[in-house]
Amino acid sequence: MSGVRGLSRLLSARRLALAKAWPTVLQTGTRGFHFTVDGNKRASAKVSDSISAQYPVVDHEFDAVVVGAGGAGLRAAFGLSEAGFNTACVTKLFPTRSHTVAAQGGINAALGNMEEDNWRWHFYDTVKGSDWLGDQDAIHYMTEQAPAAVVELENYGMPFSRTEDGKIYQRAFGGQSLKFGKGGQAHRCCCVADRTGHSLLHTLYGRSLRYDTSYFVEYFALDLLMENGECRGVIALCIEDGSIHRIRAKNTVVATGGYGRTYFSCTSAHTSTGDGTAMITRAGLPCQDLEFVQFHPTGIYGAGCLITEGCRGEGGILINSQGERFMERYAPVAKDLASRDVVSRSMTLEIREGRGCGPEKDHVYLQLHHLPPEQLATRLPGISETAMIFAGVDVTKEPIPVLPTVHYNMGGIPTNYKGQVLRHVNGQDQIVPGLYACGEAACASVHGANRLGANSLLDLVVFGRACALSIEESCRPGDKVPPIKPNAGEESVMNLDKLRFADGSIRTSELRLSMQKSMQNHAAVFRVGSVLQEGCGKISKLYGDLKHLKTFDRGMVWNTDLVETLELQNLMLCALQTIYGAEARKESRGAHAREDYKVRIDEYDYSKPIQGQQKKPFEEHWRKHTLSYVDVGTGKVTLEYRPVIDKTLNEADCATVPPAIRSY
């Protein structure tokens, strides 16, 4: 090992010498495409060896840095550049490989193209869908901004599906209603057939090319640069050559996506590893509501690939082994278009009670073949292809085998509706200076305990834009960037070096699989205290096993072994907070369904008139947000709670929706 390490140090010294010429030497080859940090701004980069003589560190300075280049990150980045800010965007993937591309169904907005609609009805549905854990000021902001956001996308060139008279086509989607739940099913979901995320991401990427944003493509963000409680940028690893980069900025936006890969079966990309959530945790800041994990009702059985809710919006139905449309029993009004948590639980109950399909009776069927073939070809072309590839099913002739699959994380980095990251001190929310978050990485909280389908793409564009607007309101391009310590980021580099030379007994892939299976078995659609407690013990033990990892690639150029190990560290922090938060929450709400605590525990019993009832103390009810912290050294999880925000931004224009019994 000493020989390997010595050779590595020699190579590192050579890289340091090369790095000193880095600001003036352009890379060659086609990989420079859309990599504008290689352009005229390179002169602003400076090499520092103050962290480590073995790891070259290149310092950069920008007005703002965005971490992540999915829908939320792109919208924030080009919004800042458009406003004149010198902006960097750090992404471990080429932008169009981000997980936004996998979203299928659509984006909600009360355009009223199919029938009369109102954004306040959308607001009501979102609050109800959140099981009254959503913050109503943020939901007000998102739903009111939705129509303008969709029109903006259309103006950018997004090729929405159209009605015969040329308007944007809107399909039915789960949990959507008219007239505050009293007017029947709403058609509010704007779509591009069943490839809406693909079109949205490519549209935003195309728009981003108009602006002079510096893209650090295939750079892995290691940690935030924090000084005196303020965020002053990010430190990142260049995956291509192994150099370390400190990107100092007055404003940092975290848009790194979710942490779906904490589970064994999920629709998330393999890169959805909770990087931003973990960076926040290592910075000593809280994460919020991580126990609320959405299981999408229709993942392909055995593969986990997403089958959009748009199938049911177009008229598809779920059936059990008896050919029964079973959702009529669980949600008599909405049926197959009930909220996702309701449908996933109903499917699980059907399987438990022996009405599952297939030889093992462990899934149900999604039937589409009763729909006209031309409708399937025009509205659901991607699903037809996916079902054939991953299930061997011709959707015009036979049903698709489906099973609830982890799909979305309602929890994340706590923010207000302006995208500003929050900490909770002495019972009060405080803004973390210089730090913003948006997209699935953030928890605004517009989704509460359960997200409505087609609100995620809306979340991306509305709050990506909101982050840019917030920074524009509080800063000016060229404002002085606060300094950082000469050794800022030293711990991140030490951790990287430790993992690079890790020589334990457990492979990264083995430990990751153990974590994923433990989460799948102990924190699934239905949860129970004894199983959650066992899961807490198992995940804590697995977290301790990180010290026994073994990596095999000691190099620094395209070391995917090292990157996957860094991602595993991030996933472990997310898994800890998810399962400990779930064990502590002694109720059922939204996607968090406890079999030992089957009811929602609010400050009042909303199944009865509240007149004459005594309000439960904050400590005795669960209509509150979980805030979780992790001691990174020991893996100990600490939980706190903060109130849900019930007030809207303007009560006269949009009244608060009081809690009620949630049914569909």
Swiss-Prot record:
Catalytic residues, chain numbering: R340
PROSITE patterns xref list: FRD_SDH_FAD_BINDING
PTM annotation (Phosphotyrosine): residues: Y215
Location(s), subcellular: Mitochondrion inner membrane
Keyword Amino-acid biosynthesis appears in the UniProt entry: no
Regulation: Enol-oxaloacetate inhibits the succinate dehydrogenase activity.
Post-translation changes: Phosphorylation at Tyr-215 is important for efficient electron transfer in complex II and the prevention of ROS generation.
Co-factor(s): FAD
Binding residues for oxaloacetate: H296, R340, H407, R451, A454
Binding site for FAD: A69, A72, T91, K92, S98, T100, G105, A221, D275, E440, S456, L457
Residue numbers bearing the N6-succinyllysine modification: K179, K250, K335, K485, K498, K538, K547, K615
Effect noted on mutating C189G: In LS; decrease in succinate dehydrogenase activity
Membrane disposition: Peripheral membrane protein
GO cellular component: a single term: mitochondrial matrix
Pathway this chain belongs to: Carbohydrate metabolism; tricarboxylic acid cycle; fumarate from succinate (eukaryal route): step 1/1
EC number(s) recorded for this UniProt protein: 1.3.5.1, 1.1.5.-
Family: Belongs to the FAD-dependent oxidoreductase 2 family. FRD/SDH subfamily.
NCBIfam families: sdhA_forward, sdhA_frdA_Gneg
Protein name, per record: Succinate dehydrogenase [ubiquinone] flavoprotein subunit, mitochondrial
Organism from which the protein derives: Homo sapiens (Human)
Gene that this polypeptide is encoded by: SDHA
